[in-house]
Structure formats: C-alpha cells, structure tokens
C-alpha cells in the first residue's frame, strides 16, 4: 500500500509560484559551469549544497544571483527549464506558470532573446515531453529602479507572444508596489496579466497597494495578509488567489516552523490559497514535497489537499484554454487518495 506521501505525487496540481532560476540544482550548476568555463567558489556539489543553508532572504538572494553566472546560452536556459519540468511532472504538476528574472541576466550581458528563446525551447515542448502545460511570467526586480523595469519591459517587446504576464519579486521591504505603477500600467496596456510578490516580509499594506495600484490578479505569498482582518475579508470577497510557499516560508524564517503556518486558518477563513515551491532547489522541495510537508505538519485531510489543488487550476491563467482547465479540474475531482 502506498504511503500518504506517495499519494500526493500524482495528485494533479498547478504550480503558480516558481522562479526558474531557483530550480538550479547543484549538479546542474556544476555541469553548466564546466560547459561554459565558469569557476564556482565551491569545491564540489556537496559544498554548494551546504551553501544553500542560508539564514535569511538577503543571504539567499546573494547566492541566487551568484549562481546565475553559469547561465549563458539558450541551451543553458533550455536545460534548466527542462530539468524543472521533468521534476514537476514527477510530482503531479500538470500546469506551471513560470517566473523568470531578465534584469539579472541583462546585467550580465545575456540578451533577452537568449533567455526567452532558451526557456521557450523547453516550455514549448513541455506538453509533449512532460505532459505539463506552461505559461511564462516576466518578473521585475523590485530592488532595481522603475526605469530599469520599464527598459526591461521594452526589451521584451519582440517576445510578448511567449510571455503571459509580469510579476514583481526580490527584496520586498523598502520597495512598495507603488514604485512600479507606471510599469504595470504599461504592461496592462500590452494585455499582459499582472501578479506581484507582496506581504511576505512586507506589511499587509503592500498587498493592498498591489491590488489597488498595480491591478494585480494574484498575490504571490500574501502571508501577512492575515494581520489585517479587513484585508482578509476583501481577499475572500474578491476571490483573490494567494500563491503560498510553505517550505520557503520556513527557510526564510517567515514562520518559525511549518506547524506555525497559518494555512489552515487561511483556508477556514475562505481565502483562495494555493501551495507552491518558490525556489525548490534552495528551499528543499518541489510542489509535491510542499503538499506533503503541509499534510504532515498541519494535519490536512485529503479533501483539504484537493481544495488546494482545485484552487491552483482556478487561479491559473488558463482562460485562453478553458477546455484544458476543465480537464485538469476533472482530474482533481476524480483523484482518490489511498486508504490510510
């Protein structure tokens, strides 16, 4: 008989909060470094894996940007995305909406086309190769200037047929959403969907700004929304999805332990929560691992897990393929958890 953990892997789910650069496992990092003649300041894969034991968001971001140096060519980005999609498919992911950080690559002299075309080689073949449908979301770095974000959006112009939406990530505190008002207005005029990280380390007021100023359709993280009852009421009323990342929350010390995570209370309040992996190579788990972690730590029932899976497809940007979304939702409802 399958263990409960095994049962969560085939549970159909969508991943809506995933940074492709955050899927760079040590093995691939060293392989790409060797391919491109890049010297890494780590003796071997084990030493690099040990470096993944960071203490806070900033130390994580420092390592995250440092390792991007191995990503140079279209093939590198294709291999990165394909490796993620294979792992995601093995953990029941049927649809993935993938973030990428072009500013970090442009600053290294890697052109927008290299990044997008490389990623698209993997994403475009993902349905056939892995059974996973995909969308691509361009993220702006909030600790860079709004002018840099606008230049990045302009550089993406030739590739907008590959890009579904825009997002906002990186260090949150001190960089309120309002800083990017004009960029998001420009993205909206281009017909791009809009999401933003808010309420992870930043206050609930950032969530309100993301909704009212940036016009976002989903809140990435949004964990601190629970501190503002009026905001919770609004999120429930407007059915605004929250893309939570439980293992990330623990590693970045947003919560002390998984047992302290407010996910059950958020679901009880009627919030439309989803479970995602964020930067799984760094945070110790992919989508199915996050589902299992909250099951074990929070005692979530099969029906609660089904609700999370259902929410993930309902919150996805699959409006252009409602037939596919309906098929995925039917798979969620048809799934049967093995008896304990």
UniProtKB/Swiss-Prot annotation:
Keywords: Hydrolase, Metal-binding, Nucleotide metabolism, Zinc. SUPFAM superfamilies: Metallo-dependent hydrolases. One of its GO terms (biological process) is hypoxanthine salvage. Its cofactor is Zn(2+). CDD domains: ADA (cd01320). Coiled coil: none annotated. Its EC number is 3.5.4.2. Transmembrane segments: none annotated. The record marks 221 as: Important for catalytic activity. It is an enzyme of class 3 (hydrolase). It catalyses: adenine + H2O + H(+) = hypoxanthine + NH4(+). Zn(2+) binds at residues 17, 19, 197, 278. GO terms for molecular function: adenine deaminase activity; zinc ion binding. Binds 1 zinc ion per subunit. Pfam families: A_deaminase. The active site is at 200 (proton donor). Substrate binds at residue 279. Catalyzes the hydrolytic deamination of adenine to hypoxanthine. Plays an important role in the purine salvage pathway and in nitrogen catabolism. HAMAP family: Adenine_deaminase. Belongs to the metallo-dependent hydrolases superfamily. Adenosine and AMP deaminases family. Adenine deaminase type 2 subfamily. This is Adenine deaminase. The lineage of its organism: Bacteria, Bacillati, Actinomycetota, Actinomycetes, Kitasatosporales.
